[in-house]
Amino acid sequence: MRVLGLHRASSYISVHSNAKITRALRASSNIIGRSHTLWNGCSSTQADKLNCFSTSQKFRQSPSINKSGTASGNLPLSGITVVALEQAIAGPFCTRQLADLGARIIKIERPGKGDFNRDHDQRVKGLCSHFVWTNRSKESLALDLKQQQDLDALKKILSKADVLVQNLAPGATERMGLGYETLKQQHPRLIVCDISGYGSTGPYRDKKAYDLLIQSEAGFLSVTGSPGQPAKSGISIADIAAGTTAFNNILAAIIQRGKTGKGSRLDVSMLESMAEWMSFPMYYATDGAAPPPMSGAEHASIYPYGPFDTGGGGKVMLGMQNEREWGIFCKDILDKPALTEDHRFANTSLRSKNRKELRQIIEEVFSSMEADAVLEKLQSAGIANAKLNDMAGLWAHPQLKARDRWAQVQSPKGLIPALKPAGAAETSDVRMDPIPAVGEHNEAIFKEFDISR
């Protein structure tokens, strides 16, 4: 991937893991609020000590109001300015999540064309689906960083920023005078997050990295699909993993800066992020052991756990993970209690080993019922189940509707539906600001930072 003509390195967040971080960030925001009451009576040094959360709070404009009426100043990262040298997915997904929490994102784009991710498709009112998903609530600043005037403008903005997120080729920022060691000397409180395919060191440092290539390098394709037919993820999972990792580390770095007063450098690798997500398959194959078998949409080692045909209405997903559930399933769903005594299915390992025979038994029973009837019966018996949804089913999902998870964001092509950030305590306490046009905020940003053109 290329950013401003350079190399691209392009995120599902664990709500539970981020909840503690968000509470800590809210606490830090409260510190800022208390420090404001003392600001006028402090020297600049005293004020900096009090205002440990944001480097640039005194340069901040009034909190913006999004289309739903929520003040971004109420959110945990209000007061944090992030400069983003980003394209594709990993960087933009990282910074969009920061924006969701109230951070100000100044997205640097190529004049005229902007982020190349704007042009991958035109599926959303003529806009790219990838770009729409990852770039709401941002300001677009079009700069040609090959021109000294524009590079100087960026450096001036960085002097008042809290975080720099970039996914240029390793070494590119150093050539522009924007390497971490240089920035550290000039702006010791600045947090710099570098996202790349393989990291800033090692033999793969300069190797091109696209999402599917990282899926392959990380072994992901070896555990998806069916034997002889490896399958990639249907989403940009390696990019998302890297964006998620960057997001989490930036939150931690902001909290750490509140303790030490110092910025830091984060070196996020797509490969390392994806390797972390390989979870049990990686440990399954430890010490030279055989990896888990490829099992399509089924679980590799637990059975029955996967999709099953019915008599009509499509497949159903079901799963069970203990002997109590297996007994209920045999008695109440299959009406075959004797199966619990069948030596072929005596435990999870044997059921997995003999899954072909067990599948035949299950689908023979299900063949007399419609999918909805099977799901209702499973639900009544307390057996975990799910519909095998497509994207239309997701848009219409009754649970998302019941929890008021949909909103609209403004864009250059009008209002676009969007999913609210996962994990918001109150559905009204979310930020859903517009998706910007290329260079839409140039004039306002130049004026704010006193940049002459």
Predicted feature residues:
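An anion-binding loop in the catalytic cleft
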Residues: 310-314, 361, 372, 418-453
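A glycine-rich dinucleotide-binding beta-alpha-beta segment and adjacent secondary-structure elements
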Residues: 380-429
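Glycine-rich beta-alpha junction loops
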Residues: 112, 198-199, 270-275, 312-314, ...
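N-terminal mitochondrial targeting presequence
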Residues: 1-71
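N-terminal helix-loop segment corresponding to the beta1-alpha1 unit
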Residues: 39-42, 49-259, 294, 437, ...
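Oxidoreductase and adenylate-handling cofactor-binding alpha/beta cores
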Residues: 243-263, 276-289, 330-336
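A short glycine-threonine-serine/GTX helix/turn-capping micro-motif
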Residues: 230-241, 263-265, 294-299, 303-305, ...
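Aromatic-enriched alpha-helical interface/lid elements that frame and gate functional surfaces
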Residues: 304-381, 385
